[in-house]
Amino acid sequence: MDQTRTLGKTKLKVKRIGFGANAVGGHNLFPNLNDETGKDLVRTALDGGVNFIDTAFIYGLGRSEELIGEVVQERGVRNELIIATKGAHKEVDGSIELDNSREFLRSEVEKSLKRLKTDYIDLYYVHFPDGKTPLAEVAGTLKELKDEGKIKAIGASNLDYQQLQDFNADGYLEVFQAEYSLIQRDAEKELLPYCEKQGISFIPYFPLASGLLTGKFTQDTVFDDFRKDKPQFQGETFIHNLKKVDKLKAVAEEKQADTAHVALAWLLTRPAIDAIIPGAKRPEQLQDNLKTLNIELTEDEVNFISDIFK
């Protein structure tokens, strides 16, 4: 498959397999994370030819950005990378609140620039809507930052269909991020078609449905993290999903490939999806994700896989 793509209407050229860096410094998301292991993940990504790194303030409340900034500075490769980060969260009296105000987002971008040790951010997303600030106004704030050269492209994440249209009222939106995988296909109803029509690049998160599409789980698998609260990992739904994954596994075996690679390769055949950003907690997982680029799916295989998960 094509190794690189331009993200939608932007001038950002990315390798189609990026790196979702929530396990780099994301101590508030995962137990027992080690900063040096996190930095090794970034180094492994760079060594593997990854040029698209996705992070956010909420990943360790800025720690992920700091660790990425340290490695990028150490390697001297800033100009070769596309770095995406996100903002909207703030700490207030020990709790996390959302803020999309102009003053807050401008301040957050400045803080992200410092943490990442850079003078520009390639792609900046509003991570979540705050439910108060008009979304066209939020997009306008990012347009100001783009015009000033602080960010190169405008992104938004976690919007419903109406919110997506509101954010893009002036046509400023360039990249949109939402949950999408073979297991979770709600985006196909309205979000993906809208992005395709508008020339907006769609970046799916949870592309492996939080590991469900790796084929490594059984009915006896016990989850002790956020997955235990997700419906797709519970009761009959979980068993039903495992049966579908078994069918996907059979397709992968025919192609002498891993189940996860086939699931990711399927995503890269979808309209508007220029790149994906699977996460990893260990360097070997990250190296493994890169093997997806070796998978070629025929049209019949793409349709067969789609039908399994209808």
UniProtKB/Swiss-Prot annotation:
Record keyword rRNA-binding present: no
Binding sites annotated in the UniProt record for NADP(+): F206, P207, L208, A209, S210, G211, L212, L213, T214, G215, K216
One of the record's GO cellular component terms: cytosol
Entry-linked CDD domains: AKR_AKR11A1_11D1
Enzyme Commission identifier(s): 1.-.-.-
Record has NADP as a keyword: yes
Highest taxon of source: Bacteria
First and last residue of the signal peptide: none
SUPFAM superfamilies (alphabetical): NAD(P)-linked oxidoreductase
Keywords recorded for this protein, A-Z: NADP, Oxidoreductase
Residues annotated as the enzyme's active site: Y59 (proton donor)
GO MF term (any one): oxidoreductase activity
Assigned protein family: Belongs to the aldo/keto reductase family. Aldo/keto reductase 2 subfamily.
Protein name: Uncharacterized oxidoreductase YccK
